[in-house]
UniProtKB/Swiss-Prot annotation:
Involved in the gluconeogenesis. Catalyzes stereospecifically the conversion of dihydroxyacetone phosphate (DHAP) to D-glyceraldehyde-3-phosphate (G3P). Signal peptide: none annotated. PANTHER family: TRIOSEPHOSPHATE ISOMERASE. It comes from the Bacteria. Homodimer. It comes from Lachnoclostridium phytofermentans (strain ATCC 700394 / DSM 18823 / ISDg) (Clostridium phytofermentans). GO terms for molecular function: triose-phosphate isomerase activity. This is Triosephosphate isomerase. The gene is tpiA. The keyword Lipid biosynthesis does not apply. GO terms for biological process: gluconeogenesis; glyceraldehyde-3-phosphate biosynthetic process; glycerol catabolic process; glycolytic process. Belongs to the triosephosphate isomerase family. Pathway: Carbohydrate biosynthesis; gluconeogenesis; Carbohydrate degradation; glycolysis; D-glyceraldehyde 3-phosphate from glycerone phosphate: step 1/1.
Length: 248
């Protein structure tokens, strides 16, 4: 049985002082021994968040990282910088990074490899646009994203990663993929991993659904056979996140 993982993506929200306040507010609400709880916070708040989360079941993740360890990359953050302060997870390839910062599948792959090299668990995002869904190419599109993201990743490494399926048309729009749509794509992702690495790895890897997850939609989504939790956006900034974590 795969352990559920529910991660909050705070995006560009909350100052360091606001981060402390929110984590203190959420600590008692997200207690759940059966779920891995992760807060992915802005880079400037990572150290503060790690300190605030001490003694709780909350792990802290970054929202992005670069694929080099040092050098003339103004504004970027290296994986060894993240591990040095105790970061455990990193979101890679979020649709907003792809859209606003021109991240390609190849860039995503480089970041995945470097995160794994440094012992950081990557939360690898994939998803389709509304146009791609309407064209009926959702599965083909996502399979392509997965295959490139996992280039040169070993089966042992792949089993430790997290994949987040985020239909782009459902992010921050209030629209949610139906439970059937979400399960269909997550199942297809697991099949793709099985083709790349075999059934054992496919059954080990955890797949999240991300896209306007709410306390109301979480119970049905998270009880699907191939959905192992969620990558939660706006709702992770509210007390409602506690209800999502304790969805049962």
């Amino acid at each position: 049985m795969r352990r559920k993982i529910i991660a909050g993506n705070w995006k560009m929200n909350k100052t360091p002082s606001e981060t402390v306040k929110l984590i203190e507010e959420l600590k008692p609400l997200v207690k759940n021994d059966d779920v891995d709880v992760v807060f992915c916070v802005p880079a400037i708040s990572l150290t503060t968040a790690i300190e605030a989360a001490k003694g709780s079941n909350i792990s802290i993740g970054a929202e992005n990282m670069f694929y080099e360890e040092s050098g003339a990359y103004t504004g970027e953050i290296a994986p060894n910088m993240l591990t040095d302060i105790g970061v455990k997870y990193v979101i890679i390839g979020h649709s907003e990074r792809r859209e606003y910062f021109a991240e390609s599948d190849i860039t995503v792959n480089k970041k995945v490899l470097k995160a794994l090299e440094h012992g950081i668990t990557p939360i690898i995002c994939c998803g389709e646009s509304l146009t791609q869904r309407e064209q009926g190419i959702t599965i083909d599109w996502i399979r392509q994203q997965i295959k490139i993201a996992f280039l040169n990743v070993t089966a042992e490494q792949a089993a430790t990663t997290v994949i987040a399926y985020e239909p782009i048309w459902a992010i921050g729009t209030g629209k949610v993929a139906t439970t059937e749509q979400a399960q269909e794509v997550c199942a297809a992702i697991r099949v793709c991993i099985g083709e790349l690495y075999g059934e054992t790895t496919a059954e080990a890897i955890r797949i999240q659904y991300g896209g306007s997850v709410t306390a109301a939609s979480a119970p049905e989504l998270f009880t699907q056979s191939d959905i192992d939790g969620g990558l939660v956006g706006g709702a992770s900034l509210k007390p409602d996140f506690g209800q999502i974590v304790n969805y049962k």
